[in-house]
């Protein structure tokens, strides 16, 4: 696991070296499950915790990281994701992980709690919102349980199946922007490579109280990007071919000093 600090980002805010479209105002968030027609396929279970005027930026970044998905295997290419992240304007990588995190017989609920704390570390930000962390727990829970309704979703790929074992990929992408992130948005794409000593049909109905032998590898990185100073129409970003993935922020962070992270 590799973590950078956010001092550079905090210094920029404190020094007033740039301006965004308006002040960050603490306000309640409303949870909406949104399904829209789109000409672009994504292979992430997308979870956004952002103000409405920044939805376009969150979707644009999601589209960007779709480029890290291997079109043949649908696996998440960690090195490609780093390359994409290091090329984003007004942004920096603040945390990464690319390693095995579970290799034991474990109760699913315990595993969910452990992975939540790993995500907290990789995120590298102090997020106080209980609603956000509830969304994180829900997403992790759905990575390992409630699989039957998700069996054909784009973010899950079934791999090696046998009478005693099941392997699958599962990909999530979090976007977070609120008073805790200040004038930045954090994007956290996560890919799980999961092997369970359970036959697939059984696994589809596994619960948080069940135990099994799991091998779980996590590949993830956190990218923090300055908030856009423009409000793009949401309709544009549902067709990546008509929308620039690297549209410049007109208030560029001249002194953003975050070193690229190498794989």
Curated annotation (Swiss-Prot):
<keyword id="KW-0843">Virulence</keyword>
<keyword id="KW-0800">Toxin</keyword>
<dbReference type="InterPro" id="IPR001615">
    <property type="entry name" value="Endotoxin_CytB"/>
</dbReference>
<dbReference type="GO" id="GO:0090729">
    <property type="term" value="F:toxin activity"/>
</dbReference>
<protein>
    <recommendedName>
        <fullName>Type-2Ba cytolytic delta-endotoxin</fullName>
    </recommendedName>
</protein>
<dbReference type="Pfam" id="PF01338">
    <property type="entry name" value="Bac_thur_toxin"/>
</dbReference>
<comment type="similarity">
    <text>Belongs to the cyt1/cyt2 endotoxin family.</text>
</comment>
<dbReference type="InterPro" id="IPR035918">
    <property type="entry name" value="CytB_endotoxin-like_sf"/>
</dbReference>
<dbReference type="GO" id="GO:0030435">
    <property type="term" value="P:sporulation resulting in formation of a cellular spore"/>
</dbReference>
<dbReference type="GO" id="GO:0005576">
    <property type="term" value="C:extracellular region"/>
</dbReference>
<keyword id="KW-0749">Sporulation</keyword>
<comment type="function">
    <text>Kills the larvae of dipteran insects by making pores in the epithelial cell membrane of the insect midgut.</text>
</comment>
<keyword id="KW-0614">Plasmid</keyword>
């Amino acid at each position: 696991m590799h973590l950078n600090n956010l001092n550079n980002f905090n210094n920029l805010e404190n020094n007033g070296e740039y301006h965004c479209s308006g002040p960050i105002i603490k306000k309640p968030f409303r949870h909406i499950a949104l399904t829209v027609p789109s000409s672009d396929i994504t292979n992430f279970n997308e979870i956004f915790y952002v103000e409405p005027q920044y939805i376009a930026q969150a979707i644009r970044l999601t589209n960007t990281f779709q480029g890290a998905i291997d079109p043949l295997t649908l696996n998440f290419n960690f090195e490609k994701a780093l390359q994409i992240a290091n090329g984003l304007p007004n942004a920096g990588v603040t945390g990464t992980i690319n390693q095995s995190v579970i290799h034991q017989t474990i109760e699913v609920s315990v595993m969910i709690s452990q992975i939540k704390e790993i995500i907290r570390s990789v995120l590298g930000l102090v997020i106080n919102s209980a609603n956000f962390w509830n969304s994180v727990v829900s997403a992790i829970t759905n990575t390992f349980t409630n699989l039957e309704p998700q069996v054909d979703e784009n973010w899950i790929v079934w791999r090696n199946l046998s009478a005693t074992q099941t392997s699958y990929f599962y990909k999530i992408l979090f976007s977070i922007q609120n008073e805790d992130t200040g004038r930045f948005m954090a994007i956290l794409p996560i890919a799980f490579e999961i092997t369970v000593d359970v036959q697939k049909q059984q696994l589809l109905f596994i619960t948080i109280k069940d135990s099994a032998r799991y091998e779980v590898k996590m590949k993830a990185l956190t990218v923090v990007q300055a908030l856009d100073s423009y409000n793009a129409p949401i309709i544009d970003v549902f067709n990546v071919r008509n929308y620039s993935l690297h549209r410049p922020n007109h208030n560029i962070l001249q002194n953003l000093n975050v070193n690229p992270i190498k794989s």
